[in-house]
From Swiss-Prot:
CXXCXGXG motif repeats lie at residues 152-159, 169-176, 191-198, 205-212. The J domain is necessary and sufficient to stimulate DnaK ATPase activity. Zinc center 1 plays an important role in the autonomous, DnaK-independent chaperone activity of DnaJ. Zinc center 2 is essential for interaction with DnaK and for DnaJ activity. The keyword Plastid does not apply. Homodimer. Zn(2+) 1 binds at C152, C155, C205, C208. Binds 2 Zn(2+) ions per monomer. It comes from Rickettsia bellii (strain OSU 85-389). This is Chaperone protein DnaJ. It is found in: Cytoplasm. Zn(2+) 2 binds at C169, C172, C191, C194. Its main location: cytoplasm.
Amino acid sequence: MSQDYYQILGVSKTANSADLKKAYHKLAKQYHPDNAAAGDTNAEKKFKEINAAYEVLKDEQKRAAYDRFGHDAFQNQQARGGAGSQGGHPFGADINDIFGDFFSDFMGGGGRRKPTSSKVRGSDLKYNLTINLEEAFHGVEKNISFSSEVKCDTCHGSGSEKGETTTTCDACGGVGATRVQQGFFMIEQTCHKCQGNGQIIKNPCKKCHGLGRYHKQRNLSVNIPAGVENGTRIRHPGEGEAGIRGGNNGDLYVDIAIKPHDIYKVDGANLHCKLPISFVNAALGGEVAVPVIEGGKVNLTIPAGTQNGDQLRLCGKGMSKIRSTIRGDMLAHVHVEVPKNLSKRQRELLEELRGESANEKENDGSFFNKMKSLWS
């Protein structure tokens, strides 16, 4: 068995990247051709071995492959992959090509890139849809209109005239790419003849010009489920743009925006509203009819002594929830209204009430009396 890369660098198999780098720099400096004696071929050979070892071990993926398959297997693959290459690369071939073939052979591949398909998946589309709060509560079906690429109905997405077939590109052998030698490296580039498709259409469809799709205005009915929230995204599989030359369609994403409501403010599944009541109802209590999101009104009990800013809750009268029979609550925020214009009789009654209230305050040592005593 030949000396492996760890032995060449003089490090253990558990060496970290810092140890590898330190060992490499030390040895590279020692055996660099500029520092070697004239005619010392051993130094040049050693220098190449050091570079080859470091090129593999400094790369985590390549090092993992080397550790897994062993030095001899790697060397055998190098011998096959390096035949006919030029440029004086330490491995005699592009390191990426070597490892590409290396993995292919061990995983059952043949070292050749598989032919590419000319089919390309269509792009996804996004549509912004605005609905009102009632529609969000009940759910709604909406008709939307948008422009997109659709499958050609003449060639049925193939890109060829009726009855015509595609042929494999003779420039790239159907892989969609060709390789060009540039210095030490083998560069892969898109095939100029088939534009990366791997196939040649000899007689393109006149309607879609060989793409298998064309631009069209579309109308689509979309279902918005009850309980959607502002910002909900709904996916419609296969309703995006048609693929190229028979490729799969993309998806359509509908983003929901809910318009602000005149009465309600939304907080998750709960609804908040302002509830104006008279100061008489606030003091004495009673019932008021309040509108609800599903339509109509329900009676809400006002407890006696309700204060301005109090919250009154109607359980189960909020928004729907997606895939649930449970609803949120409605919270009414009390706003006590004080009349600005009083009749003579109303004024007399309030004056009478004020007199009685003053007597009560004096007897119970109220806050107002305590304040009064501070200033007396």
